[in-house]
Regions:
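Extreme N-terminal basic, low-complexity initiation segments
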Residues: 2-11
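N-terminal intrinsically disordered, cationic/polar leader segments
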Residues: 23-40, 44, 49-161
Length: 161
C-alpha cells in the first residue's frame, strides 16, 4: 500500500485518544485563559484533533488509557465552520460537566459546514482513575478561527479557565 493510501485510511478512521499527539496542537499565550492552535489534514481531522486537545488539557489518567465503556451519538449545528467547532467542543464539555462523560475516542460520521454527527466512546469520570488537570469553564468565541492552510486546516480556540 502506498503512503498516500495509508494516510487516507488513517484520516478516514482517525480517532483521538488521551495519548493524543501534541504535534497536532500547540498552546499560545492568552491572558488568564488557554489558547490552543490545532492542525488537521482535513476539516474532519481538525475537529477530532481539537476535541483531543480539549481532553488532553482537562484530564490526567492515573491508571493508563481510558477504557471504552459507554457510547454516545451527538449532532451539532453551527452557522459556519468556526461556530460548528465551538458548538462541538461545547457539547463535549457539557457532557463532561453534566454527565461526567470523558470522551476517549470520537468518530465523525457526518460532516458539513453547518452540521456534524459524531459517535463518542468513553467512560465516566472516576477519582481513582482520573484527575482534573485544568478546569475548563467554557469554550469561547473570542478569537476563534478555522482556516485552510498549506498543510490542511488550522483552528485557534480559547478555553476559559
Amino acid at each position: 500500500m502506498k503512503v498516500a493510501e495509508q494516510s487516507a485510511l488513517l484520516v478516514q478512521y482517525a480517532r483521538f485518544s488521551y495519548t493524543h499527539s501534541m504535534s497536532n496542537y500547540k498552546f499560545f499565550d492568552h491572558t488568564a485563559d488557554i489558547g490552543v492552535e490545532v492542525y488537521g489534514r482535513t476539516r474532519k481531522e481538525l475537529f477530532m484533533n481539537t476535541a483531543g486537545a480539549l481532553f488532553d488539557v482537562m484530564i490526567e489518567h492515573k491508571a493508563g488509557r481510558a477504557t471504552a465503556k459507554r457510547q454516545k451519538k451527538i449532532t451539532v449545528e453551527g452557522t459556519d465552520v468556526a461556530d460548528l467547532l465551538i458548538n462541538f467542543l461545547r457539547e463535549l464539555l457539557h457532557l463532561f460537566n453534566g454527565e461526567h462523560f470523558i470522551t476517549g475516542s470520537c468518530e465523525i460520521i457526518e460532516f458539513s459546514n453547518k452540521k456534524l454527527q459524531a459517535r463518542l466512546t468513553g467512560e465516566s469520570f472516576n477519582n481513582k482513575k482520573h484527575s482534573i488537570k485544568t478546569e475548563i469553564k467554557a469554550v469561547t468565541y473570542s478569537g476563534a478561527t478555522v482556516k485552510r492552510v498549506e498543510s490542511g486546516w488550522k483552528a485557534r480556540i480559547i478555553f476559559d479557565v
